[in-house]
């Protein structure tokens, strides 16, 4: 960890236990665990959501759900986050953590290509986080 990362880490709130557990399980089970957003990025996403106060959020690229859980923590009651993951093998892992989180009721997990799923969701999204295949 370089000096800037250490500084940011020291000033950030501690990682939530559930997110820490998800980080650990992702590193043990996922093929490419480096794709996980992680603690600092998660805190940044939560802060951005709190500042923007969106009612509808779209995330493209769920992976194991860390960023979705982080953003959901920043959502106000009644707001919703739709997250789209193309890899159906990650569905059970991500959903299990959404189900255990106090913010999980704000999250709707969709499995499939974002090119197909996003238009079917309809409506307007106040915030979109693209963390999936950027080439498409």
Report the location of each language-model feature.
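S-adenosylmethionine/decaboxylated-SAM
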Residues: 38-136
């Amino acid at each position: 960890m370089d000096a800037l990362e250490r500084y940011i880490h020291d000033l950030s709130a501690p990682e939530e236990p559930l997110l820490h557990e998800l980080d650990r399980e992702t590193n043990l089970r996922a093929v490419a665990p480096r794709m996980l957003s992680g603690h600092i990025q998660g805190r940044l996403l939560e802060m951005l959501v709190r500042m923007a106060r969106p009612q509808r959020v779209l995330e493209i690229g769920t992976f194991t759900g860390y960023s979705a859980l982080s953003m959901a923590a920043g959502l106000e009651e009644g707001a919703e986050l739709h997250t789209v993951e193309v890899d159906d093998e990650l569905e059970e892992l991500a959903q299990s953590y959404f189900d255990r989180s106090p913010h999980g009721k704000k999250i709707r997990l969709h499995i499939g290509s974002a090119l197909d799923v996003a238009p079917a969701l309809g409506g307007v999204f106040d915030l979109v986080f693209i963390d999936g295949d950027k080439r498409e």
